[in-house]
């Protein structure tokens, strides 16, 4: 049997009955939304609903939370925080994801997001870029709505959003 997949017979779930309220000392620094996202990712990818995730489920759950992890890192996390059976329970997952989320650099994350919009690598988000992202996200926004979004945040009035304008929009209020 490979250590990458769950065995047929599983240990009982190690979650307390009130696991939705279980927190670590660091998780108090997370927003309710962030804690909810961690719980939702775990529950979504714990496909057999036994309170434990294997290698593949851990990798996909971490990716869903915005962490693109390599095989070696996932294996290390399972070895250090999982059980002898190679499975990880919710409390360990919550602890790891809390640390990772709190260690994020918001400006770095926003620069990566900007690059997703700027797929033609012009250094600016154009109406065309915004239209593509809206379509990929399944948003049905009209041309006028998309243009209004650009106009509202286009500080230098060049018809596009550059990185500085994007950061100003996204970091407003922090």
Swiss-Prot record:
Disruption phenotype: Resistance to the estrogen receptor-modulating drug toremifene. GO terms for molecular function: calcium ion binding. SUPFAM superfamilies: EF-hand. Residues 1-11 have a biased composition (Basic residues). SMART domains: EFh. It comes from the Eukaryota. Residues 33-68, 105-140, 141-174 form the EF-hand domain. It holds the Pfam family EF-hand_7. Keywords: Calcium, Metal-binding, Repeat. The breast cancer drug toremifene modulates the ability of CML1 to activate calcineurin (CNA1). Calmodulin-like protein which plays a role in the activation of calcineurin (CNA1). This is Calmodulin-like protein 1. It comes from Cryptococcus neoformans var. grubii serotype A (strain H99 / ATCC 208821 / CBS 10515 / FGSC 9487) (Filobasidiella neoformans var. grubii). The lineage of its organism: Eukaryota, Fungi, Dikarya, Basidiomycota, Agaricomycotina. The gene is CML1.
